[in-house]
């Protein structure tokens, strides 16, 4: 919480310096890396190590959902498939492309819209 008085009297300052916050502030002013930087970096490192376990657990769960197929299961899947010949597929797809019964129709423009003809 912000204090109302910006400046403290000597008596107030001495009382504040005796508190834990006052002693920590004075130590931080003298050695900022030791009392601010080092705890900050330690917290960041500890959090990364702590959250790495959660990430590993998440990937373990995902791996459990995706299971490897055994040879028997793979053979069961192959039973129902039809055999594919490249030439037959090529000619089949060519026949699908021969649809010349369509007609290009221009979409009417809205009133006031330009034709974009150069």
Swiss-Prot record:
Top-rank taxon, per record: Eukaryota
Transmembrane portions of the chain: 32-52
One annotated Gene Ontology cellular component of this protein: mitochondrial inner membrane
Cellular location(s): Mitochondrion inner membrane
Major location category of this protein: mitochondrion
Entry function: Required for the assembly of the mitochondrial respiratory chain complex IV (CIV), also known as cytochrome c oxidase. May participate in merging the COX1 and COX2 assembly lines.
PANTHER family: CYTOCHROME C OXIDASE ASSEMBLY PROTEIN COX16 HOMOLOG, MITOCHONDRIAL, MITOCHONDRIAL OUTER MEMBRANE PROTEIN 25
Protein name (database record): Cytochrome c oxidase assembly protein COX16, mitochondrial
Source organism per UniProt: Yarrowia lipolytica (strain CLIB 122 / E 150) (Yeast)
Source organism phylogeny: Eukaryota, Fungi, Dikarya, Ascomycota, Saccharomycotina
């Amino acid at each position: 919480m912000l204090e109302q008085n910006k400046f403290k009297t000597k008596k107030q300052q001495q009382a504040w310096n005796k508190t834990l916050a006052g002693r920590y502030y004075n130590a931080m002013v003298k050695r900022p890396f030791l009392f601010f930087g080092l705890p900050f970096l330690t917290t960041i490192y500890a959090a990364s190590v702590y959250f790495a376990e959660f990430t590993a657990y998440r990937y373990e769960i995902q791996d459990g959902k995706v299971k490897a197929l055994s040879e028997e299961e793979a053979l069961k899947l192959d039973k129902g498939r039809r055999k594919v010949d490249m030439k037959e597929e090529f000619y089949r797809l060519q026949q699908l492309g021969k649809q010349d019964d369509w007609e290009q129709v221009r979409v009417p423009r809205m009133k006031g819209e330009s034709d974009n003809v150069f």
